[in-house]
Amino acid sequence: MNDSPIARAILRYHPDWEPPPDHHEWNKCLCPFHGDETPSAAVSYDLQGYNCMACGVRGDVISIIRHEEEVTFAEAKRIAENLSVGGNVPVQRKPARKPSRRVFGESRAGRPSGTKPVRSGIRGRPTPWT
């Protein structure tokens, strides 16, 4: 099952690891993340997950990449996309969007035309005793 994304992610960092054949939902295997002589880990090709009972490494493709490379979720997702079939296609980066909240002291030039500012509640009203 070397064509599975979870197997490709593990083989990227541990090329000597042998993926187990796909017999069950969770297939026993030797853990590549620590020295292992008896199978203490399991990989699921259906769920695209990995779990080691001995060292505690578990997760999906992105969490394994984050564990090994110590990168953010977005960077791990880009790496995982390159591991997938047809991974030679460059990943499109979205342009940074302008934040929707206005910063204190920022001009109101972006206000739509024809609108007037809202008066403040009590301070805009005359007091009855003046």
Swiss-Prot record:
InterPro entries: DNA_primase_Znf_CHC2, DnaG_primase, Znf_CHC2. Residues 85-130 are annotated as: Disordered. This is Gene 58 protein. Keywords: Metal-binding, Zinc, Zinc-finger. It comes from Mycobacterium phage L5 (Mycobacteriophage L5). The keyword Protein transport does not apply. GO terms for molecular function: DNA binding; DNA-directed RNA polymerase activity; zinc ion binding. The gene is 58. GO terms for biological process: DNA replication, synthesis of primer. It comes from the Viruses.
